[in-house]
């Protein structure tokens, strides 16, 4: 696996769409968490209106299903380093992490997590907004092996063997 040469993206931030997760997508994220026998989650999201609403919906659905949310962490689309957010994201040591939000902020946060923390993609679930090939290549597929997520229709996807598997 090629190492990241910097936790920051080489290009400046863009203004990405801010889609809301569908009910089927949220149900699939919760089902994936249950299938992995998770009891605790940390939910991370961008700070856009739909990302925040999606994080709240995941939290409430998870809690109603008997799970425990240890923390909800947000990150900006642009920042100097994302180190503070990355440190707060991994500190509670949940069974699983869940991530949602616009592309650029997620990519920057994920690169910082890989660069500065013991965060493993194998213990992370993501929403459909993060499944686009151009999004995943901002971080690099070899760095995301094991990342699993839900599509808008409730089907699931995974990064495995350096490839996106729908």
Regions picked out by a protein language model, each given a short descriptive name:
Residues 12-74:
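An alpha-beta-alpha
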Residues 161-166:
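Long, C-terminal catalytic modules of enzymes
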């Amino acid at each position: 696996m090629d190492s990241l040469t910097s936790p920051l993206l080489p290009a400046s931030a863009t203004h990405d769409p801010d889609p809301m997760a569908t009910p089927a997508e949220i149900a699939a994220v919760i089902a994936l968490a249950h299938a992995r026998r998770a009891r605790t989650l940390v939910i991370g999201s961008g700070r856009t209106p739909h990302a925040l609403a999606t994080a709240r919906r995941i939290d409430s659905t998870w809690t109603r299903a008997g799970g425990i949310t240890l923390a909800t962490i947000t990150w900006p689309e642009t920042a100097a380093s994302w180190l503070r957010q990355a440190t707060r994201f991994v500190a509670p040591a949940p069974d699983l992490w869940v991530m949602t939000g616009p592309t650029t902020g997620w990519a920057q946060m994920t690169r910082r997590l890989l660069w500065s923390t013991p965060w493993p993609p194998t213990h992370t679930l993501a929403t459909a907004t993060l499944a686009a090939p151009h999004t995943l290549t901002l971080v690099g597929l070899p760095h995301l092996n094991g990342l699993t997520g839900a599509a808008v229709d409730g089907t699931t996807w995974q990064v495995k063997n350096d490839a996106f598997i729908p």
